[in-house]
Design a protein with these regions (language model features):
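Short, well-ordered beta-strand elements
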Residues: 269-271, 276-286, 408
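Short, hydrophobic/aromatic-rich segments at coil-to-beta transitions
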Residues: 252-258, 325-331, 350-354, 369-385, ...
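Short, gly/Ser/Thr-rich active-site loops of penicillin-recognizing serine hydrolases
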Residues: 283-344, 349, 411-436
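N-terminal glycine/threonine-rich, aromatic-flanked beta-hairpin/loop signature
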Residues: 336-371
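Short, surface-exposed loop or secondary-structure junction motifs
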Residues: 30-32, 41, 85-264, 268-269
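Short, conserved catalytic-motif segment at the N-terminal edge
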Residues: 1-56, 76-80, 108-110, 114, ...
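Contiguous, well-ordered beta-strand patches that form the walls/edges
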Residues: 358-404, 414-415
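Short amphipathic alpha-helical segments
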Residues: 2-10, 158, 317, 331
Length: 436
């Protein structure tokens, strides 16, 4: 089985700049293959092994979902009771709680995270009205679980989820002893410590064998009807739906249950094929996802008849269409934690626009979509304390209604080729047309 796995992994690491890759396959509750290649620490020349833990990024979400569902089965919380902001736990688990996109990371062991998540934990749409991937929704789930059980998420997940499955080394934490060093896309090491306001969305650590086992054994923890509800996925695209903490394939082909994860120095994925009794985990210690994807496609292509990448990889891009807004100027504000920040937008010929905020202006291409009148990204710094921490780019996504452009402004950073991965901060935005 997978006799050429070593050569495939070596090629993927070389072609895509991944220091290491760890792979595991489990069948009916037993690990049947576990291999690791490359270096867990390039500076110290420490090899990766099958016992090396890796950061999981968003593959943490299925663990948090399992903890919430266990608490529900124990009668400690109700998946359909409205909670913070009016969203139910079921809606939050499905990323349908109405909360916008967000992530924040603080690197190193010292100091406190610089971004307070509270001002960003707001509704951008009515709960239940649509899908939007929301780390802060999983932050709220962690709070709900803690209020219901009296234990913080990490402790409860260890005692009621991971421990009962025999996965004692699997954890939610700010660091993990012996873990693979995380590396930027150009090979620089990240600091060992990592903190965020959304640990239940992002701060899992595990070895590949542990993750492969979790991906197929979590239903043992739940009542049959709850396990079935986890896989009751609402469509998010042609080939995928999102259930309670897992992506679930749709349409023709094998049933696949999966979740990927990516952040600074992390590209991870877990996939199970319940009808075959198989699960696979692939972990790497680089921001770039290409090596992970190449290895995963090879393994699943060999083991799962009918596998196609679109059955596990959500595509959140929205097709563009030509801009229909006339040339002219718009003015308004971005609502930031400090208050309203002035913003001006000038529509230019050739599907371009000039954006001005504070003392910075930039011209960039813009486009429309079926739901947005205008979207674009500009190399301008939103002049707020939070954005200055690590979000030097400003994206705008605006719809047109009743003569006004409304939507959101996203302060973020493109990748980690300079410094480390920054934060993604969503702000309400409203502009009105200026007289010509």
């Amino acid at each position: 089985m997978l006799d050429d796995l070593g050569a495939r992994c070596a090629r993927a690491m070389a072609e895509h700049g991944s220091p290491s890759v760890s792979v595991a396959v489990a069948a009916r509750g037993e690990v049947i293959l576990a291999e690791a290649y490359g270096l867990a620490d390039t500076g110290a020349r420490i090899p990766a092994t099958t016992h090396t833990p890796y950061a999981l990024a968003s593959v943490t979400k299925p663990v948090t979902a399992a903890a919430v569902c266990v608490a529900a089965d124990e009668g400690l919380l109700d998946l359909d009771a409205p909670g913070p902001l009016g969203a139910t736990p079921r809606q939050l688990l499905r990323h349908r709680g109405g909360i916008g996109a967000h992530y924040d990371f603080h690197y190193g062991e010292q100091g406190e995270p610089a971004v307070d998540p509270e001002p960003y934990t707001r509704l951008s749409r009515a709960p239940g009205s649509g899908f939007e991937y929301a780390n802060l929704g999983y932050r709220l789930l962690g709070r709900l679980q803690e209020d219901a059980t009296g234990q913080d998420l990490a402790t409860y997940a260890h005692e009621r989820v991971l421990g009962p499955l025999g996965l004692d080394g699997f954890r939610i934490a700010t660091a993990c002893p012996g873990a693979a060093t995380r590396y930027t896309s150009d090979g620089r090491p990240y600091p060992g410590g990592l903190r965020t306001s959304h640990p239940g969305a992002s701060l899992g650590w595990a070895t590949a064998p542990q993750l492969a086992l979790f991906a197929q054994t979590w239903p043992r923890l739940l009542k049959p009807e709850t396990a079935a509800a986890v896989l009751d996925a609402v469509p998010i695209g042609e080939h995928l739906g999102y259930g309670l903490g897992w992506c679930v394939s749709r349409g023709e082909g094998p049933l696949l249950v999966s979740h990927g994860g990516g952040m600074g120095g992390v590209a991870a994925m877990a996939v199970s094929a319940p009808e075959l009794g198989l699960s696979v985990a692939v972990l790497t210690n680089t921001t770039v996802k290409a090596a992970r994807d190449a290895v995963l496609a090879h393994v699943l292509g060999e083991l799962v008849p009918g596998f196609r990448p679109e059955l596990i990889s959500p595509v959140f891009s929205v097709p563009a269409r030509p801009l229909s807004l006339a040339e002219g100027e718009w003015a308004g504000h971005v609502l930031a934690p400090e208050g309203e920040v002035p913003l001006r937008l000038r529509i230019l010929p050739g599907s371009r626009a000039e954006l001005t905020t504070g003392d910075e202006s930039a011209v960039a291409p813009v486009e429309a979509t079926d739901t947005l009148a205008l979207r674009g990204s500009f190399p301008v710094q939103l002049p707020t304390a939070d954005a200055r921490v690590g979000s030097p780019v400003l994206g705008i996504e605006l719809g047109l209604a009743e003569g006004a452009l409304t939507g959101r402004a996203l302060a973020y950073k493109n990748g980690d080729t300079e410094g480390f991965l920054g934060n993604l901060l969503s702000h309400p935005c409203a502009l009105k047309s200026l007289p010509r």
